[in-house]
Amino acid sequence: HRNALIDTLIASDQVRNTMHELQLKGHTSSKLERRARRHAKSVAANMSHGKIRVFLSLLTWFWNRLYSGVHVSGVEVLAQSSDTHTLIYVPSHRSHVDYLVLSYTLYMQGLMIPHIAAGDNLNMPLVGRFLRGGGAFFMRRSFRADPLYASVFAEYVYQLAQRGHCLEFFPEGGRSRTGRLLPAKFGLLKMCVDSQLRGLPKPLAFVPVYFGYEIVLEGSSYLSELRGANKKRENILDILSSLKLIRKNFGELHVNFGAPIKLDDWLANHKDKNL
């Protein structure tokens, strides 16, 4: 499935047109095709139901150790909306726990687990492979220096939506260290709108999600950063050392789903405006 999707990406009109433009600037066709395939492999998820089942079993144990309760509200409307729309989850971002608890909550409610846009800083040895199996696909912080990468990534988002896969990404781009919402970054939002305008079997609907923590798992590192310490890039040793936190209790966790924002309706209401 993953290899077939990568082949489709490379053969798409969007990627081929970008390659043609780069050929006019002196790049060779064979090198561009190898680069495009390398980009696609670096991005694409490799969702495995077997890995997901193992992952979710571990998460059940994890939540029971870490939290005194996980409370969910607003999920009832999602099943009905998913019949007519492909859902795009757009949560607030406070913790690395966010995407774990969202996938877990949706699975326990009998809903499709989303493909999750993750920063390539999480694509570490072993961890990255495991996250891909759970539906993560990886993205660079900036696409500006590489138009071929940008084209491959945008086509990947379109192909996922074309196949009816739910998506998840954080509009803030990164985790908020202060608890306040960060200004939205519009790259992935634009790709979703562009995908809708290209034509999809089902229109898209954005689902706001709020995570409320009594105590944030990364609270101590956030405090250090706010006091002036340098922000650390994630690595495997940090993840392994964080396992000691399971001896603590972090109180209750609340997951609140907002009403889906149907993109087809929104576009129809704004068709006379310059978007």
Please state what every model-predicted region is:
Residues 1-275:
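Membrane-interfacial terminal anchoring regions of lipid-handling membrane enzymes
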